[in-house]
Amino acid sequence: MGKIIEIFNRIAYNVLLALYQPFWAAVLLAFLAMFLYLYGREHGWKKNNFIRNMFATWWSSFKSSSNFRRTFLLAFYTAMILLRTVLNREIWFDPLGKIFGGWGLYEDGVFTTESIENFILFIPFSILLLWAFQQELLGESKSIGFGKTVWKATKVVAVFSFMIEFTQLLFHLGTFQISDLTYNTLGGAIGGVIYYLGYCRKRKNKIRNRGQLSEH
């Protein structure tokens, strides 16, 4: 009898675990699907043309709007981060077990690149963030400052990273580690530096091209 109960407990555990891992990804997809449904209904899309209208609207905006393309790339990369860090993660029974770990390249004598990955992960994110929302974050002036650019990127990434770590802690989806928060934030700061350097280079090229045109 005890063996049968153990088997049923194991089956129930595996089933619940299999359902829990993709739970938040399923919630997000369901939310987006219902948003599309409401949008289509408000615009009078018919059911038999719903998919075609959806892709036609998306493609039209993608071709005509640079802001839409930038925001799409940011949303895509953000989804990739969430899938790696929160969505579809295994359950950790002790999310605070390694709160002060993960600083070096070796853990228990085993080489690991987790710290480097956490650093690199948010460099493209902060670049895409500033690229998509430069006016909203840095103002509408023709030139942007180095300090403000790096500070805004660092602050947004720090808050976003903390929300990820807190979600992992709250729902036992990974471990809460101060090192993750630190390396993610540093990556965001470096992304801000790279964006500023790219912005300055682009601005200098524009000024140079204007000078060449005025000479002719």
Briefly describe each language-model feature range.
Residues 2-173, 178, 192-216:
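Bulky hydrophobic segments
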